[in-house]
Amino acid sequence: MMKWKRIVSAAVCVCMAGMLITGCGSKSDSSSKKRIIRVALSQSEEHPEYKGMETFKKYVEEKLGDKYEVQLYPNELLGGQTKAIELTQTGAIDFTIAGTPNLEIFADVYEVFSMPYLFTSEDAYFAAMNDTDYMNKIYASTEDTGLQVVTWYNVGTRNFYAKKAINTPDDLKGLKMRVQQSPASIKMCNAFGAAASPMAFGEVYTAIQQGVIDGAE
C-alpha cells in the first residue's frame, strides 16, 4: 500500500498541481481481475486539473495496465467536494481532489489555509507549503477518519468575482457571496460585511445567473 501511495504522489506532482486525498480503497473488478481506481473531480474535462488526471491515468495504465484501470468522474458527477471526500472515506472511490476548506469538517487544522492575509509574500507561502515536516503533520490529522491527504497544489491567488468591482473588503458589505462549505471561509466573509452563502462549486454560476448570490470567492 505504501509503495502504491508513493507512486500516486509522484505521478500527480509531476502532472498537475492538487490537494489529493486517498481513502481505504475500493474493490477489484472480479470479471477482469483488475484493480479499479476511481477518482472524483469537481472540474470539467477541459480544466487543467482533469488534464492532469488524464495524464495520471495514462501513466498508470501504460505501466500497470494489466493490474489497474483508472476511472475519472469530473463535473461533480459523484457529488460536491465534501460528498466526494466522504465517498473516499468509505472506500466507494479511491481518490478525490478537493480544496482545503472542504477538509475543515474532517480536521479543523485545515482552517489555517482559509485565513486571509496569512502570508506576507508568495515566497513565504511556498516556503511554508514546501516544508515537508510541517505538511506531513497536517496530512496526518485525518488518518483516524479513514482518509489520507497525499499532496497539494497551488490554485493561485484567492479572489472575489461579483456584479461590481471588489477592490477592498469594504466593497463586500451587503453582498451575498458564495464561499466554500468551510467554517473559516464563512466567518471570513461575514467579517468583511458580506452575507456568506456556502454552496458546492457546481451550483455557483446558476446561482449568480438567478440572482441567488451577488458573487463568489
State where each predicted segment sits.
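Extracytoplasmic "Venus flytrap"
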Residues: R38-T55, P74-G80
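Short, polar/charged alpha-helical segment
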Residues: E46-Q71, K187-C189
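Immediate post-signal peptide segment of exported/extracytoplasmic ligand-binding proteins
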Residues: G25-L41, E54, E61-E69, E143, ...
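Contiguous mixed-secondary-structure segments that line small-molecule binding/active-site clefts
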Residues: K57-E61, Q89, G99-A195
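Short, low-complexity disordered leader/linker segments with a strong preference
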Residues: M1-I36, E62
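Short helix-initiation/N-cap motifs at beta->coil->alpha
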Residues: Y73-E86, Q180-A184, S197-Q210
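Conserved N-terminal glycine/acidic-rich loop preference
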Residues: S31-K34, G52-M53, G79-L87, I93-I97
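Alpha-to-beta junction loops
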Residues: D66-Y68, A84-A98, G193-A196, Q210-E217
